[in-house]
């Protein structure tokens, strides 16, 4: 695959999303694997509360009208990156189309070499409070 291939294992979500958005706007194709292993920093209860509030937003008259927020790990990561792109401009939408996010590693990418974003590496946090995206996803889906 052409472009950049990123392993999301132990990457900080916001920092990774910022870097990926810059790559996308520069015209590169970006593929992220292991989206479920991306981490979010902060107090677990506050993170749950913030994301649950987002997913509970709906039109009271007709809840099928949205807004819609993702509940699966790959979609949570993808939506976070979308928030860092100029979504209402054609350049932002074109950049968003160049993004692929997967849970785990797809069979077609088994032998591919993945890069790590140094600025977003979660190993530098030490014992800081963190939450993995798969834990957040299980909470949002009620599992």
Name each model-derived stretch.
Residues 1-143:
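Ribosome-associated RNA-binding proteins
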């Amino acid at each position: 695959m052409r472009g950049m291939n990123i392993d999301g294992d132990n990457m900080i979500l916001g920092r990774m999303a910022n870097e990926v958005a810059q790559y996308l706007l520069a015209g590169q194709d970006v593929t992220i694997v292991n989206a479920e292993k991306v981490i979010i920093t902060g107090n677990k209860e506050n993170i749950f509360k913030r994301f649950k509030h987002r997913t509970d937003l709906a039109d009271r008259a007709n809840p099928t009208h949205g807004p819609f927020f993702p509940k699966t790990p790959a979609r949570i990561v993808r939506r976070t990156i979308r928030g860092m792109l100029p979504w209402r401009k054609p350049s932002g939408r074109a950049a968003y189309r160049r993004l692929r996010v997967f849970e785990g590693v797809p069979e077609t990418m088994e032998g591919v070499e993945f890069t790590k974003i140094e600025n977003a590496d979660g190993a530098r946090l030490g014992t800081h409070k963190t939450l993995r995206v798969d834990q957040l996803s299980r909470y949002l889906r009620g599992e």
